[in-house]
């Protein structure tokens, strides 16, 4: 079926970075009833799960962490579902479609952070924390200041990520389903609030698991059909792609995406350490019963995601062959209908027809819902658990804390809908880049050093953490994306698109310097408490286990 799509889907480098954002204007398309029916089936099924989960959510632990009863395998699938976004699917396959081999290099950037989580973070995080990563950071440091900093870092990351998701959701749904942009944004916001409000982490987990299974199935089918077309020969796949691509053999050469070593290093560090500082990802490690299951979670998640990113590479090259060389998918000017981000969607039509096109469109929508639900729960827990129950009203009952959490979900949902509408025609791709930079420059150094460095003090954590956060924001504003492309200045004050190399360095140096020079009695006491923390982090003695329902 030839769909008359006339959209500009310009992808900045970070737009493929889990942004789900289609930048630029889109023209509303004819209603795609196959996609809508399949999506409605998904919604009805997941709302049924939410109803089931709501009957099992009886306590704070149930709401935040599903009672710690999720298995390692289930959590691995849920983590993959939380992390693999629609733009990982559409954006990276589009990068391969346009740039060839460079798309694979970019996709690997999302994986390199997971060994760090596996070997350095997962086990100790589970043994030291209960509901949020601030539990870990404040284990032996001053509760108030550390939780405020951690919550601010979490909320900024969640807000930026959420806006990008909502705008991307509206654009994507307008493009794929033919629905009005504002209706699409409201629909995503309302469903997101329902999942989190009534089902908590249990419903969110199962939405993410179902979405991961659907996405892996859809991508596997597309890759299988592509490989079947070339006789299951990678040599034939690459040869045919090079034969029809305008760049020819150059699509097999690396180095076209990032222009200089500093940018390459900064991008790599942002992806690697940013992943290890995303609050909605870290929160998932508290849903399992113990450190062993936390390690298994990362093992399974890395396997699922690695497999998925390999599939996007095959899908991208398949799109070069079956979509790029087919005039049916081109507009009058010879450009891909809907822009390059639609390469995977057109490929779905090419290998599976209308029905499979509807399925992939519905999966893209389901993907967005799974990601925003995880983000909303992470933001709500930062407010209710870190700020309300441990800073502003110490000793609050579980019921009071849960009430604040649910009010926060409603507020976050309404804000996300409003901002999604306000940012409709804005370039929001930079927001995800900024979210990763802040996660890498504020959250990650605090988590890592609080678990591993015995000389860390509250003073060092506060000053270094705020320095990292502020540096990331300022350098991003002064860089080419915001300063030149959005604000319209001639030349960027900070020449690199990615601030992570500099902001991470500032954070670690700041934390080290201000901790090392802290000679206060409070600092000495905090250093002495490290031994007890170390024993707990290694043994899990005293950790809250999962409960049977």
UniProtKB/Swiss-Prot annotation:
A single BP term in Gene Ontology: plasma membrane acetate transport
TM stretches of this protein: 33-53, 77-97, 103-123, 148-168, 183-203, 206-226, 262-282, 303-323, 355-375, 404-424, 428-448, 464-484, 493-513
Subcellular location: Cell inner membrane
The keyword Cell membrane is annotated on this UniProt entry: yes
A GO term for molecular function: acetate transmembrane transporter activity
Keyword Membrane: yes
Keywords, sorted A to Z: Cell inner membrane, Cell membrane, Ion transport, Membrane, Sodium, Sodium transport, Symport, Transmembrane, Transmembrane helix, Transport
InterPro entries attached to this UniProt entry: Cation/Ac_symporter_ActP, Na/Glc_symporter_sf, Na/solute_symporter, Na/solute_symporter_CS, Sodium:Solute_Symporter
GO CC terms: plasma membrane
Membrane topology, record value: Multi-pass membrane protein
Function: Transports acetate.
PANTHER family: CATION_ACETATE SYMPORTER ACTP, SODIUM/PROLINE SYMPORTER-RELATED
Family per similarity comment: Belongs to the sodium:solute symporter (SSF) (TC 2.A.21) family.
Name of protein: Cation/acetate symporter ActP
Organism: Shigella boydii serotype 4 (strain Sb227)
């Amino acid at each position: 079926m030839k769909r008359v799509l006339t959209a500009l889907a310009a992808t900045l480098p970070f737009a493929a970075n889990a942004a789900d954002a289609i930048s630029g204007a889109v023209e509303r398309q004819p209603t795609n009833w196959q996609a809508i029916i399949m999506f409605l089936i998904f919604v009805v099924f997941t709302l049924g799960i939410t109803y089931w989960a709501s009957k099992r959510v009886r306590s704070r632990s149930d709401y935040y962490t599903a009672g710690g009863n999720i298995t390692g395998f289930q959590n691995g699938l849920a983590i993959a579902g939380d992390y693999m976004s629609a733009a990982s699917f559409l954006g990276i396959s589009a990068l391969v479609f346009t740039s060839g081999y460079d798309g694979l290099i970019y996709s690997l950037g999302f994986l390199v952070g997971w060994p760090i989580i596996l070997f350095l973070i997962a086990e100790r995080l589970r043994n030291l924390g209960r509901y949020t990563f601030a539990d870990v950071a404040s284990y032996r440091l001053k509760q108030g200041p550390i939780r405020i900093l951690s919550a601010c870092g979490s909320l900024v990351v969640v807000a930026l990520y959420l806006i990008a998701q909502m705008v991307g959701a509206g654009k994507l749904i307008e493009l794929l389903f033919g629905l009005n942009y504002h209706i699409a944004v409201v629909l995503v916001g309302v469903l997101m609030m329902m999942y989190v409000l009534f089902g908590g982490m249990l419903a969110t987990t199962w939405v993410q698991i179902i979405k991961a299974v659907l996405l892996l199935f859809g991508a596997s089918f597309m890759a299988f059909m592509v490989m079947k077309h070339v006789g299951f020969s990678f040599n034939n796949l690459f040869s045919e792609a090079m034969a029809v691509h305008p760049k020819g053999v150059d699509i097999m050469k690396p180095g076209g995406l990032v222009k200089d070593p500093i940018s390459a290093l900064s991008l790599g560090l942002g992806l690697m350490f940013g992943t290890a500082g995303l609050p909605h990802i870290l929160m998932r490690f508290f849903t399992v019963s113990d450190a062993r299951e936390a390690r298994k979670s990362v093992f399974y998640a890395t396997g699922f995601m690695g497999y998925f990113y390999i599939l996007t590479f095959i899908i991208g090259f398949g799109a070069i062959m079956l979509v790029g060389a087919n005039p049916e998918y081109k507009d009058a000017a010879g450009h891909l209908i809907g822009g390059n981000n639609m390469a995977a969607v057109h490929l779905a039509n090419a290998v599976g027809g209308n029905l499979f096109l509807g399925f992939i469109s519905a999966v893209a929508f389901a993907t967005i819902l799974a990601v925003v639900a995880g983000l909303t729960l992470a933001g709500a827990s930062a407010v209710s658990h870190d700020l309300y129950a441990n800073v502003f009203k110490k000793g609050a009952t579980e019921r009071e804390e849960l009430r604040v959490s649910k009010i926060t979900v409603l507020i976050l949902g309404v804000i996300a809908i409003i901002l999604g509408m306000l940012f409709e025609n804005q370039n929001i791709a930079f927001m995800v880049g900024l979210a990763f930079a802040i996660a890498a420059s504020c959250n990650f150094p605090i988590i890592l050093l609080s678990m591993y460095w015995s000389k860390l003090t509250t003073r060092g954590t506060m000053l270094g953490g705020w320095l990292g956060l502020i540096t990331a924001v300022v350098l991003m504003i002064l860089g080419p994306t915001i300063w030149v492309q959005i604000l319209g200045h001639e030349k960027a004050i900070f020449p690199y698109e990615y601030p992570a190399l500099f902001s991470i360095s500032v954070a670690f140096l700041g934390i080290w310097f201000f901790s090392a020079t802290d000679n206060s009695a409070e600092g000495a006491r905090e250093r002495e408490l490290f031994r007890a923390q170390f024993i707990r982090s290694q043994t899990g003695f005293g950790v809250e286990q999962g409960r049977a329902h």
